[in-house]
Amino acid sequence: MSRTDYAFESLPISDRAKRAKAAGADLLVSIHGNSAENPNANGARVYYNADTSFSKTAESKLLATAMAEEIDRLCPSSTATSTVDGSNLAMLNGTGNIPSVLVETCFLTNEADARNALSEEWQDRMAEAIADTISATAKGICTKD
């Protein structure tokens, strides 16, 4: 856990994976709110590192898929189904042998998603979906090389 309170810490994205590695993390889950120029963009997105040279691509994809399914189950949205995307995002690069995903919980630039994000019930369900997925899948994918 890199934050334990609401204090904002400006840590460059390139350093976040390094911090996880230095801490001996078994898993990296980075949680964000998304935005887009198109106000119709909506729903959750779960990204994993699809670079074939990354040693934990399969484990990361498994975690991302399970996470998207659990988000859809616990946070049904009238806006969109969660999607999983293999990507080359800076946040997911440099994680070495740590399975890692980036969760964009919603699009804050979409009116319906933003309304959901303000709901304490929705926040609790999203947190539960993420925590349940970590708990259910971590044992099977968190093995050090």
Segments predicted by a language model, with ranges:
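Catalytic-core regions of hydrolytic enzymes
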Residues: 1-63
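Stable alpha-helical elements in mature extracytoplasmic
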Residues: 12-16, 59-63, 67, 122, ...
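Solvent-exposed polar/charged
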Residues: 21-22, 73, 94
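Glycine-rich loops and low-complexity Gly/Arg-rich segments
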Residues: 26-28, 53-56, 70-73, 126-130
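Active-site-adjacent mobile loop/cap segments within catalytic or ligand-binding domains
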Residues: 30-38, 47, 80-145
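Active-site-adjacent substrate-binding region
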Residues: 58-85
